[in-house]
A protein has these predicted regions:
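Acidic/His- and Gly-rich active-site-bordering loop/insert found
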Residues: 2-108, 128-134
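Acidic/histidine-rich catalytic neighborhood of metal-dependent amide-processing enzymes
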Residues: 114, 118-140
C-alpha cells in the first residue's frame, strides 16, 4: 500500500503545483487578512469532498483558522498542522508571483509554509484514496 500512496502522490505533482501556485499567488501576510481567509476557504473546499467537517474559526481583528476533522473509530490518528500567513506585505504576490525555475519553486510563502499546505492536502487525498478510511484525520 505504501508504494501505491507514493505513486499517487507523484502522479499528483501537477495538481499539487497548481494548488501551490494558487495559494502562493494570494497575499496572506500580516496585513492581508482577507487573503488568509481566501486561503482558508481553498483548504476547506479541498477537504470537504473527502468527508471532512470544516470549521472556520474567526477571531476579531486577526486571521481565520481552519479546523478540519474526519473522525473515524479506527486506531490510527493523524493530525497535520500548519499556518497560512506569511511575512510578506500586500502586493508581494503580484510583484513576485509563483514560478518554477531550474526545478525550484519561488514566490511569497513557498518555503514557509504554503508548500507544506499543498503537500498536506495531497497526502490526505492519497491516504484516503488508498484505504485509510478508518483513520481519524485532523488538519489545523
Amino acid at each position: 500500500m505504501e508504494n501505491k500512496i507514493l505513486e499517487q502522490i507523484k502522479k499528483s505533482e501537477t495538481a499539487m503545483l497548481d494548488t501551490l501556485a494558487q495559494i502562493v499567488n494570494i497575499d496572506s501576510g500580516y496585513d492581508a487578512l482577507e487573503g488568509i481567509d481566501e486561503v482558508a476557504h481553498i483548504i476547506g473546499d479541498f477537504l470537504t469532498p473527502y468527508g471532512f467537517e470544516v470549521q472556520y474559526i474567526e477571531t476579531p481583528n486577526a486571521r481565520t483558522h481552519v479546523l478540519a476533522k474526519r473522525p473515524r473509530p479506527g486506531k490510527k490518528k493523524v493530525m497535520l498542522m500548519g499556518h497560512m500567513d506569511t511575512v510578506f506585505p500586500k502586493g508581494s504576490a503580484a510583484a513576485r508571483p509563483f514560478r518554477i525555475e531550474d526545478g525550484k519553486a519561488y514566490g511569497p510563502g513557498v518555503m514557509d509554509m504554503k508548500a507544506g499546505i499543498a503537500i498536506s492536502l495531497y497526502t490526505v487525498k492519497a491516504l484516503l484514496d488508498n484505504g485509510w478510511d478508518d483513520t481519524d484525520l485532523t488538519l489545523f
